[in-house]
Regions:
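Alpha-helical secondary-structure segments
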Residues: 1, 27-33, 69-70, 97-99, ...
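Ligand-site clamp/hinge motif
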Residues: 2, 59, 87-133, 250, ...
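Surface-exposed binding/hinge segments that line
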Residues: 11-54
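Gly/Pro-rich hinge or "lid" segments in bacterial periplasmic/extracellular proteins
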Residues: 27-28, 45-95, 99, 109, ...
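Extracytoplasmic/peripheral linker and loop segments enriched in polar/acidic and small residues
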Residues: 166, 255, 259-269, 295-361, ...
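Structural transition elements
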Residues: 190-222, 239-242
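Ligand/substrate-recognition segments at binding pockets and active sites
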Residues: 201, 221-287, 327, 355
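Long beta-strand-rich cores associated with HINT superfamily self-processing modules
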Residues: 357-382
Length: 382
């Protein structure tokens, strides 16, 4: 199974660790064997990164595709323009578009300008602060899509002073999440108390986490920092809202004696040279089922454990949750994991975003859902 190959380094490897064997029963059936009880395993298989593909195609399928979708790869250029041509034999019917061009534009501001000038017809990552640019303009349509995606700030728990859980919690307590929702997202987001679990997920733990400056100062003093701490937040425009989030947090943290400097870094190299490299950096994740996101972002052995958080009791909690067949007990276990994150986590998650999608008014029949669920064969352009 390719996803479990350590040389591949898939972030979904930890989530699929329970799978021991996959047996082909017939042309439409497979039998999956697990080494433990896993009540929600069918949910895991809905992950957008898990696919059944032809044997031996793993190294090339990302560039070539296999021709079963509504569009076929004609030209692949990860740093330029990838061209997709309509698949006339698509099982749900021929697409309404002859071609789709996917243009790589790493910088958020540049993407907005490309939309305004007509270089592109759709931008699914427009900051809400720029919504007014498109509202009332007959050349564009705007759509707000609620999601479980989140933006935040990650502190490496293996690096001082963030190796002290009291310091990490103090930083998180000093943040006014509702103010971030209002100022950064224009109200179009759902407050999170540092849980990565989507607001719509059945295991979501809803908590109150109002800003607590006195509590933050108290924790810093207990940790040996009565005069506060200094930190540098590494930011880029890879995610257009990151600079604004950092600027708002800078003012909020100062109230608790936390001096935060902001350092801009190149967007193009952010994931390779900043994220999981610097002591404090901005982060973003797409929605996943509760079990997947808790394993991928926080389990001790996870490749994308961005805060380097390690806790044997937390790992055991997740294992117990997976194997619990009683729904109420399973829910309690997943929620206990989220309570632990509120106390100990290195990642500050202020909110889950509603996504602002802006398209040219020429684009028709675009589903108001996340990109992975769009029925692309129905989309047309006048």
């Amino acid at each position: 199974m390719r996803v479990k190959d350590p040389e591949i380094g898939s972030p979904a490897k930890k989530s699929m660790s329970a799978v021991t064997d996959i047996e082909v029963v017939d042309s439409h059936t497979v039998k999956i064997k697990l080494n433990t009880s896993f009540a929600d395993f069918p949910l895991l298989l809905t992950d957008y990164r898990l696919r059944m593909i032809p044997s031996g195609s793993g190294d090339t399928i990302g560039q070539t595709g296999i021709g079963t979708g509504p569009f076929i790869v004609d030209k692949f250029d990860a740093e330029g323009t990838t061209i997709l041509k309509a698949n006339p034999d698509y099982w749900e019917g021929a697409p309404g578009l002859a071609e789709v061009h996917v243009i790589a534009i790493p910088d958020g501001e540049a993407r907005v300008q490309a939309l305004l000038t007509g270089q592109i017809d759709m931008n699914r990552y427009v900051p809400f602060a720029q919504k007014k640019i498109f509202d009332g303009n007959s050349k564009f349509n705007t759509t707000v899509v609620p999601t479980g995606n989140w933006r935040g700030m990650v502190m490496r728990t293996d690096t001082a002073p963030f190796d002290n859980p009291k310091v990490r919690k103090a930083v998180r307590m000093a943040v006014d999440r509702q103010e971030l929702v209002d100022l950064v997202m224009g109200g179009a987001a759902t407050v999170s108390c540092d849980t990565p679990v989507s607001p719509s997920d059945q295991y979501r733990l809803n908590m109150n986490c109002d800003q607590d400056i006195n509590g933050a100062k108290k924790l810093l003093a207990e940790a040996g920092y009565p005069n506060g701490i200094e930190m540098t937040i590494h930011v880029s425009t890879k995610e257009p809202t990151w600079p604004t989030i950092a600027e708002v947090m800078q003012q909020q943290l100062a109230k608790a004696g936390i001096k935060a400097d902001i350092q801009m870094t190149p967007s193009k190299s952010y994931w390779k040279e900043t994220w999981m490299k610097k002591a404090v950096a901005m982060t973003r994740w797409n929605e996943r089922p509760a079990d997947s996101i808790l394993h991928e972002a926080y389990h001790s052995g996870a490749k994308w454990n961005e805060s380097f958080y390690k806790s044997t009791s937390f790992d055991k909690n997740l294992a117990d949750a997976r194997g619990e067949l009683d729904f109420d007990k399973r829910k309690k276990a997943y929620q206990n994991a989220q309570k632990t994150l509120w106390e100990e986590a290195g990642t500050m998650i202020p909110y889950h975003v509603s996504k602002l999608v802006v398209t040219s008014s020429r684009v028709k029949n675009l589903d108001e859902v996340e990109v992975f669920s769009v029925r692309w064969h129905k989309v047309k352009v006048d």
